[in-house]
Amino acid sequence: MKVVIQRVSQASVTIDSKIVAKIQKGLLILVGIEDSDNQEDINWLSSKIINLRIFEDKNEVMNLSVKDINGEIIVVSQFTLQALTKKGNRPSYIKASKPEIAIPLYQSFVSQLETELGKKVQTGIFGADMKVSLINDGPVTIIIDSKNKE
């Protein structure tokens, strides 16, 4: 499971000209799921994200987590994070899970984030053509791959 985490001052997801998710200060998380992902990946990754200290404290040191600041989260599925670009110029998405595998894992990931954050997590709609808007705060953008634990 690969994620791109962006610290935002606000973010939203629009589908067919309708805003389906919107947050203020918090995290926008893009998630790409592969066939070998499982609950262990979800548990490790959600704990890492919730406890990641990327928000500034009163001394302007990145020492606070999204939970510490009572921040919000939007999660957006993005199979293109699993792109393979080694051969040629057209990315291959063969590593990306098919919806029948990815959707339950995606839902479990969102549910685990909600449990650890202690509140509802906003989401896009899996597989939809989404317009994602954000104001990146910092900018702070972090990429994590659960397979490498980094």
Curated annotation (Swiss-Prot):
- What SUPFAM superfamilies does the annotation carry? DTD-like
Reaction it catalyzes: glycyl-tRNA(Ala) + H2O = tRNA(Ala) + glycine + H(+); a D-aminoacyl-tRNA + H2O = a tRNA + a D-alpha-amino acid + H(+)
- Sorted alphabetically, which Gene3D superfamilies does this protein's record hold? D-tyrosyl-tRNA(Tyr) deacylase
**What is the annotated localization of this protein?**
Cytoplasm
EC number(s): the record gives: 3.1.1.96
Its family remark reads: Belongs to the DTD family.
Q: What is the recorded name of this protein?
A: D-aminoacyl-tRNA deacylase
Q: What is the lineage of its organism?
A: Bacteria, Pseudomonadati, Bacteroidota, Flavobacteriia, Flavobacteriales
Per the record, the gene is: dtd
